Amino acid sequence: MSTVNVQIGLHELLNGSNAQIQLSVPQLVEKVLMRNEGKLTSTGAVSASTGKYTGRSPKDKFIVKEASVADKIAWGAVNQPISEEHFNKLYTKVLEYLKEKEELFVFKGFAGADRNYRLPIQVINEYAWHNLFVHQLFIRPTEEELTTHESGFTIVSAPNFKADPAVDGTNSEAFIMVSFEKRIVLIGGTEYAGEMKKSIFSIMNFLLPEQDILSMHCSANVGEEGDVALFFGLSGTGKTTLSADPNRKLIGDDEHGWSDNGVFNIEGGCYAKCVNLSHEKEPQIFDAIKFGSVLENVIINNQTRIADYNDTTLTENTRAAYPMHAIDNIVLPSVAGHPNTIIFLTADASGVLPPISKLSKEQAMYHFLSGYTSKLAGTERGVTSPQATFSTCFGSPFLPLDASRYAEMLGEKIEKHDAKVFLVNTGWTGGEYGVGKRMNLGYTRAMIQAALSGELAKTETAKHDIFGLEVPLHVPGVPDEVLMPEQTWADKAAYKAKAIELANEFKENFKKFESVSEDIINLGGPIA
């Protein structure tokens, strides 16, 4: 199937009598309720369930193996290839399926808040609530922009269309396929709305580096003086909590680009975790869940329609989608200057990494490629053992290119713009999980404040004898003994053994980066 035929098929779909294009938020909310796709909550948000798929389905994600991209993609478990033939046949079937639907919902908008680098996108949805979701998550066009909007990428989403693995070359009924030549994302068999968000992020992770822009899985904020900070970190490291600062304005909570102009948000909204959400803990997120926002897999009281954020019956991965303007203290448009400070967050359950350390350029590249944190294993028979988790560039499921490409760009930009990089451990202190305790949040905030203010630039440091990290000896508001992790352990020999164990896990994980320069390994990694 040629690109021309693909476009003809799309044109027919978009011009069919069932296509509802660019409905407003109130119109979409009405459609969701009339079609019985979701419920209205007590705060006016729409609540929907995603069925059996309550999270991303990485084994069902494919990139079409096309001549123009075949030698650029880092093929493997993350970027699984699928043939053009399989894609073309499935695409034709999905289009025929959607043509028969009573209604289709179309959103046209953008990915990328910097107008110089934004990608015009359109999303064709089987579900009204999915269309409301993308309306809130991506960047909404003005009426004037809509008149000249020409899509550079189209998502075609048909959650009720199930693939046949024997015929379609998929691994299950669900599929998320990206064709870079045809500029199409094809999604079916899963109702999880996050697949649409992350598909566009994966695409931007391919397109932006081609324009010498580093795409990043991080949150970003800006201070009153215009100083920009980036926060990288995997789930559970405190990224959302620590980047929500009343004294700083939020640029974005999840996906950013770093160009020669500075930093920009890729999205126009937030996709926040809701598990155990309360007004006390996360007032910004709690208050953003209002009319037009979308709740995903959150249990709602049938009578009062009040959301119960502590109920994880459906999943722990409960989510809220809302536009940036639903929260106070933001930058609009979501663009800012070059980062002054970069924070890598890790929740080290082995309790051996310092609570804060300064990183050289090589160490920054090493820890960026490592993307380390801990996940806690199950607590069967009362035994808990933390498991080291490494997610390349703090976002391995979304990186189509070789990881070294992103790391090299980060190194170049750190050097060019003199960004200061810190590794912050929000995990355990005084012993590993089960012995020590979680790092005091107040101390972590004080350390980050000292990093952002420039205070740590002039603070005396000591080199960690196992990880080679420069550890500040004094931070205002933090007891000195907390800064050196070994000092917090009663058993110093046990600390050393545990630290060497983690250092070896870093080294073992790093063996997969064959194309990385020796400098990053020799100057960036553990020294013992």
UniProtKB/Swiss-Prot annotation:
ATP binds at K198, H217, G233, L234, S235, G236, T237, G238, K239, T240, T241, E282, R319, T444. Pathway: Carbohydrate biosynthesis; gluconeogenesis. PROSITE patterns: PEPCK_ATP. The keyword Aminoacyl-tRNA synthetase does not apply. GO terms for cellular component: cytosol. GO terms for biological process: gluconeogenesis. InterPro entries: PEP_carboxykinase_ATP, PEP_carboxykinase_C, PEP_carboxykinase_N, PEPCK_ATP_CS. It is found in: Cytoplasm. Substrate binds at R56, Y192, K198, R319. Mn(2+) binds at K198, H217, D254. Its EC number is 4.1.1.49. Signal peptide: none annotated. Binds 1 Mn(2+) ion per subunit. Keywords: ATP-binding, Cytoplasm, Decarboxylase, Gluconeogenesis, Lyase, Manganese, Metal-binding, Nucleotide-binding. It holds the Pfam family PEPCK_ATP. Coiled coil: none annotated. GO terms for molecular function: ATP binding; metal ion binding; phosphoenolpyruvate carboxykinase (ATP) activity. CDD domains: PEPCK_ATP (cd00484). It catalyses: oxaloacetate + ATP = phosphoenolpyruvate + ADP + CO2. Its cofactor is Mn(2+). It comes from the Bacteria. HAMAP family: PEPCK_ATP. Involved in the gluconeogenesis. Catalyzes the conversion of oxaloacetate (OAA) to phosphoenolpyruvate (PEP) through direct phosphoryl transfer between the nucleoside triphosphate and OAA. Belongs to the phosphoenolpyruvate carboxykinase (ATP) family. This is Phosphoenolpyruvate carboxykinase (ATP). It comes from Bacillus cereus (strain G9842). The lineage of its organism: Bacteria, Bacillati, Bacillota, Bacilli, Bacillales.
